[in-house]
């Protein structure tokens, strides 16, 4: 009887508990929007909590990079997707963000029976069951994990792009519209990776 209970407990702990999805870079003026999805069992969800996984915005870049390999190792599956600045300008940020999420979900080996999406907006193209959790990256471990995966992936891209777009301090601002970034846009002009739909005329003159 005891062995049966222990076996049942292990089955519960190893069962997929959460499939969380989140995006980063939605408000930036340069570069793509990234999304990530992370699949966790009940057991590994608890372990990642113990490691300190939480909303990526509340972690230092160093801590996010330290947590990333742990998340990838302990996740049952994960996927990363992105939508380019051009797609954002053509489709609008909401549709482009949804597209990046769908691309991330398509990287999974199996279609999940249910996903948990960060924020209040439905992922409209998704045909399966979904839940929306406002501030989900602070409440749901799989979403917090996804936010870290997406954030590190996007930050790594920004670091690589710094070499080509050195006049915009992309490494420092990560593509967001800081005063310094706008000053450099006025000085150097806009690039093919700037989101033109996010820039006002006053930002360019």
Swiss-Prot record:
A GO BP entry is: DNA replication, removal of RNA primer
Binding-site residues for a divalent metal cation, renumbered to this chain: 22-23, 118
**Superkingdom of origin organism:** Bacteria
User: Where does this polypeptide localize?
Assistant: Cytoplasm
Cofactor notes:
Manganese or magnesium. Binds 1 divalent metal ion per monomer in the absence of substrate. May bind a second metal ion after substrate binding.
Which EC number applies? 3.1.26.4
Alphabetized InterPro entries for the sequence: RNase_HII (IPR022898), RNase_HII/HIII (IPR001352), RNase_HII/HIII_dom (IPR024567), RNaseH-like_sf (IPR012337), RNaseH_sf (IPR036397)
Q: Name one GO cellular component term.
A: cytoplasm
Cite the Gene3D superfamilies for this sequence.
Ribonuclease H-like superfamily/Ribonuclease H (3.30.420.10)
Short name of any one Pfam family annotated for the protein: RNase_HII
Residues making up the signal peptide according to the UniProt record:
none
- Mind listing the UniProt keywords for this protein, alphabetically? Cytoplasm, Endonuclease, Hydrolase, Manganese, Metal-binding, Nuclease
Q: Name one GO molecular function term.
A: RNA binding
> Which segments constitute the RNase H type-2 domain?
16-205
The cofactors it requires, by name, are: Mn(2+); Mg(2+)
Catalytic reaction annotation: Endonucleolytic cleavage to 5'-phosphomonoester
Role this protein plays: Endonuclease that specifically degrades the RNA of RNA-DNA hybrids.
Q: Which HAMAP family match?
A: RNase_HII_B
The UniProt similarity line reads: Belongs to the RNase HII family.
- Identify this protein by name: Ribonuclease HII
Query: Native species of this protein?
Result: Prochlorococcus marinus (strain MIT 9312)
